[in-house]
Amino acid sequence: EEATLVVTAGTTMYGLTELGGLVSGESVVVIGPGPIGLLGVAIAKSLGASPVSLIGTRNDRLEIGKKLGADYVFNVKEEKNIVEAVKKKVSNLGVDYVIECAGTEQALNDAILMTNRGGKICLAAFPHKAVKINIPHMVINNIYMYGIRGEGKSATHRAMTFMKEKKTILK
């Protein structure tokens, strides 16, 4: 059970640190409260991201996200405009990082629109077919989008050490 958590945490850690260069104090939004998304909340918070927000459709998963460190949770079904709701709570300019774990066209475009100029979007999930995304907005705002497929040995080792030190992730 813990080994599965380490591999999943390693994926998120790799996306935030190795590829994303997360700096303490930067804002992170996680879209999709599945295993990668929930551990993304815990890892981002433990790395010093602030605030950390979680977006999803299931209140039970959003509650778990709060316990793992989410400062704000948003239920897409309860928000008229999720991008505006996030910007209102976090920053009118947008967020520094989005970890996209839902894999839907809507989630991808919401991620693009809520990301601050110069911000980063980490794709941890992907749609099962081609989708249209707002490339002009990304280019105009210098938004960097990258994907993660796996965690890599070094990130898994770092995640294991990190999780031993930050035992709250495992509780």
Predicted segments with their positions:
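Mid-domain Rossmann-like dinucleotide-binding core that forms the NAD(H)/NADP(H) cofactor-binding site
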Residues: 2-79, 84
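Glycine-centered, small-residue-biased loops immediately flanking beta-strands
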Residues: 26, 119-120
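Generic hydrophobic/aromatic pocket-lining and core-packing "Φ" positions
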Residues: 41, 62, 108-112, 135
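A short helix->loop->beta-strand "cap" motif at the edges of active sites that frequently abuts
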Residues: 49-50, 119, 141-143
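C-terminal substrate-binding/catalytic core of Rossmann-like NAD(P)-dependent dehydrogenases/reductases
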Residues: 83-88, 92, 128-171
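N-terminal Rossmann-like NAD(P) cofactor-binding module of classical short-chain dehydrogenase/reductase
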Residues: 96-99
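Helix-to-beta-strand junctions that scaffold the AdoMet/dcAdoMet cofactor pocket
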Residues: 115-117
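Acidic carboxylate diad motif detector
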Residues: 124-125
